[in-house]
């Protein structure tokens, strides 16, 4: 949407705001002015590059109205204004509440009426100057009573309502809000919306969203400015100025189309300029195209003549091919007759082939068997290696078990020490028993005293419990005596058992250890002996086998080297033989003339012949077409001198063989200066430098044939380099197109010439030389076979020797490494055996003493069991008697019984301590038993370890047995291997014999083949000529001529070829056509140039059409937008002017006013004129009216704009100042009618105005402070009328 223009008055526009203070981050003081539109000059420079769719899509839709005139529609109203220290308002002053429709502010001059408007302007963001102050800090109240006030604040409270009948209305829920602004002493200010801090932009967006016209300020008419709306000029004089046209267009909304229209206009102008340039280019290219048409037609005529020549050449070539094919078929029939004689030789050869297949099959079977045996041997060797690894592992385990013996011995010693410690526990416990027994005795005495006291108490009860008590005392004495006996018996029995166990354990343990040590010693000694013997044997055998291995490896290395050399010789020789055969075959297929001359050279009659020039050199295949097309002398024959050339000519004439052209090398010396390399345009290659020769003296002949012809990649490059400023060059392209130094162009087309020079130099060779080479090849092939057989045999022997040597080295290293450990183990075991024998002797038990100890233990057990049984019976009887006594005396003897119980408890604790000590003795006995058991377990573990050593030793024996079995099987397989190898050699010899027979048959077939080859040479000569003429046909192609249907060379039928009797007639026709074409000298490049110009012309025309279409689319869019803008503007303009007329007639009671277009055809060119006809006067321009008439005209326009685009609020300051009382009344009544859908707040001193208002806000000033009071005149009038009526009635 186009930016808004800067306004020029408070009624129409707004000024820029003061900048805020950065330190408080407060909002700006007023609406920011939009940047000015660019000038016309800058617009012309800045061209919008967007597409048409982007420009049109960027146009916003017409702005919707913020409110409508419909009844029941919601609208905004101001409820009240709160001023705090603002201007003349000291402290907090509430103005209002305002009526929803028509409120008047009245008061004497100087009381602060206009400060109400100023407060609203302050909140709406006006500058201080517009609030009649130089700066914001001046707005803060300052009086004698209120000095040094730091800030002022104004709050304007709003709400949205829906009108109802009369003064009633409905407030829309949650629609209340207020906007406030606070100014400070430092001239900064800050905004709030409903108490939340905000920027002025937020305030502007909020108020605009509710329909307050902050852009045009139609809601605000200040004192003395009412007539300025109508006084605007018809149109702004500058880009930044605003007149009636811009003012109305802003309100109507058509101004949003102004900038897109300007953009489209500039684009149309630019596209017109570009189209003019394109049109000029089209005309220029068309002129150049027409200028080339004459040259093009001459070139087409030349190509037409050449096409006729090519057709005749095609006819002649087809005739030659037909004649040669006929001769070749005759030779083929002769060859078939000879080939029937070769059937017998073929049958013999097939028989030998079948035999060879059988022998080869048998050879494969033997090789399979040989591989199987070899694989079996390798597998067994691998098994032996695995067994060897298991042997090492087992020996390590054995070593670990032996080291474990020492650890077990240490553990056994610890367990024995613990047994000794536990044996001291009974003595300590006996000491505790003695101490607790003494204490118990003292408590027993005390108990007797307490019992005595209890006895006195029990006198009265003595008869009841006397018998039981006496019986209990007897039993307790008996129990004490028996308990001592039981404890003594049990202690004696435990001691006897421990003594017996300890006495017997030492001898058993020592004997077991001795047996294990002896067995380990025997095993270690045997192993050490075996390994020493094996090491001694290996020290003799290993060097011998290593020597044999080195000898065979050296022989094998020599054979491998010789085999590589002989294979390379055979491969190179076979390649040479093939090349010689191919060369001999090619020589046989040469032409008659060249073949006859070569035969003269070989016979020595004419030795100075070198050969055909094309055969004496070679060139990369990339340049084949180029040299074949550009060098006609490739078929010339090179000789040493001119005399030799003359001899050759005489020979050909004499023999009537044919004709040939010769090059004498003695005359070529003048060209030697051209052999050096030269500088070429763009450094492209010279064709002569690309030719390779074997004989350097041939080079001048090639330079004579080629000169300084250079090779270009394509025709464009050839055209570019052919004509230099200082020199013209002969250029040939890789496609065969030639540009002569004269400027003529030849060659090219669909068919190209190639194959006249090979990629290698041809070599002359005889049948004898070929035979010698074949014999040498045969000898070398036989030697290669012999070397291969010997190498295979040596590889087998070397593999076996390497395996055996590797195994012996591993065994030697392993046995040598184990000698030291085995020796140390043997010494250690011998010392251990001696020590254990001494221990066994010392630990041997006395048989008599052992029997005596066992007998004593059995006696003590019986005594203990007998005493324990008797004590148990007495203890049970004591408990029974005690329970009976307690049951009888419990309720009578409680106090004394408690004392007795306490003593008894202490006695029991002593008894418990004694029991614990006794239990400790018993526990010590049990722990002693456990420790002794641990000793026994350790001894068992030592036994198990010894057993493990035995088992590992047994495993070692088994592994050795398995290894022996594997080695025996391997030896058996190795014994059977020579027999199979002998079968293999025998089959190879038989196959060799068959191959010799096959070679004999091949020699026999050679004679027949030579006969066939003679026939083949004739056939090949014919086929070569056929290929030559077929190649010539491939070189012939018709030129493709623009705008003429493409022709194809015709193929002649058999009858047409037979009908040709004299080919010389065709040759003469070809000569006439070639002479005609040589005379024409056309510029063939004109066709391509004409074609390029024609394509360029069509391209330029397409570009012209494209830009024309683009120009037309922008022009249509431009016209459419202009019409849309005009239609939108005129629709709104008609509504406004009609309503203006209606309003003015009503306000003036008969006058007339209208907005008229200065230019009736284009309202945007000259603008809008405001014309008025006051009542009973003629039409006048607004400038010529009186003050009151201007005021009425302006109000009529304001109300017309309100009708077109309603705004909810209006503030007017003494708009009736220039009106008489009659017009004031008319305006007042009109405003009252207009307030049905808007809120009017008017400052007025005219009673005709404020008496009609719905609410009056009275402003008065006392003590330099403005105050206010709100009244409702209609209510007051109604009350006064009611009072008057009541008084009148009274």
UniProtKB/Swiss-Prot annotation:
Gene3D superfamilies per UniProt: 1.20.1060.20, 3.30.70.1620, P-loop containing nucleotide triphosphate hydrolases
Q: One biological process GO term for this chain?
A: cell division
- Please tell me where ATP binds in this chain: 107-114
| Domain SMC hinge: start-end pairs | 607-721
Gene Ontology, cellular component aspect: condensin complex; cytosol; nucleus
Superkingdom to which the source organism belongs: Eukaryota
Q: SUPFAM superfamilies from the entry? A: P-loop containing nucleoside triphosphate hydrolases (SSF52540), Smc hinge domain (SSF75553), Tropomyosin (SSF57997)
Main localization of the protein? nucleus
Question: Where does the UniProt annotation locate this protein?
Answer: Nucleus; Cytoplasm; Chromosome
| A molecular function GO annotation | ATP binding
Instruction: Show the ranges annotated as biased composition (Basic and acidic residues).
Output: 15-27
Q: Which residues form a coiled coil?
A: 264-594, 764-1027, 1094-1129
Keywords of the record: ATP-binding, Cell cycle, Cell division, Chromosome, Coiled coil, Cytoplasm, DNA condensation, Mitosis, Nucleotide-binding, Nucleus
Q: Where is this region: Disordered?
A: 1-48
Pfam families, A to Z = SMC_hinge, SMC_N
Q: What does it do?
A: Central component of the condensin complex, a complex required for conversion of interphase chromatin into mitotic-like condense chromosomes. The condensin complex probably introduces positive supercoils into relaxed DNA in the presence of type I topoisomerases and converts nicked DNA into positive knotted forms in the presence of type II topoisomerase.
Protein family membership: Belongs to the SMC family. SMC4 subfamily.
The record's note on its domains: The SMC hinge domain, which separates the large intramolecular coiled coil regions, allows the heterodimerization with XCAP-E, forming a V-shaped heterodimer.
Q: How does it assemble?
A: Forms a heterodimer with XCAP-E/SMC2. Component of the condensin complex, which contains the XCAP-E/SMC2 and XCAP-C/SMC4 heterodimer, and three non SMC subunits that probably regulate the complex: XCAP-H/BRRN1, XCAP-D2/CNAP1 and XCAP-G/CAPG.
What protein is this chain from? Structural maintenance of chromosomes protein 4
What gene is behind this protein?
Answer: smc4
